[in-house]
Amino acid sequence: VFEKRAALVPEFAKIICVTVAFVLDNGDVKKQSFSGKDEHDVLKQVQKLLDRCGKLDFYLCGHNLKNFDIPMLAKRMIINDLMPPSILPSYDTKPWEIKAIDTKEIWQYGSYTSIGSLDLLCACVDVPTPKDGEITGDIVHSSYWYDDKLKEIVEYCEKDVLVLIDIIKKLKELK
């Protein structure tokens, strides 16, 4: 159980990849992945980028961002002796001050019991799923620790980020 679940628990996990993307005013997408075996180095690069973003009028976007990505990133930064950037909500951040769009939260429509996987949301809003490669979320841990497939994990993360942009665009286009 530990081996399967530790990757999802910030106190035991190791961040090896963070992918970010920016949608420019002209609609172009600029994507960047920070990855490597040295977690501190990966987090330091992400911290530097998010520090710059926090000074601008950016929103963080993700699927289960508020309940997974943000706490995971912040806790892993603290564990690695790094200060989480101010754009990441903290214990004293008021709900209306959180600059984040969470597609899982949007799709749940206030329900805490609904299933909200990114794959399911893709199917419901007719956006092609990124889950077409050999890596899936449930095997990222073994793909890294046993198979040394960092490159494939980065590709998996990048696909998730790009499909998230497609979902947000689709939701914004609803009439």
Where are these regions (language model features)?
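Conserved RNase H-like, two-metal-ion catalytic cores of nucleic-acid enzymes
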Residues: 1-52
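Metal-dependent phosphoesterase core characteristic of DEDDh/y 3'-5' exonuclease domains
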Residues: 13-16, 25-28, 54-155, 159-175
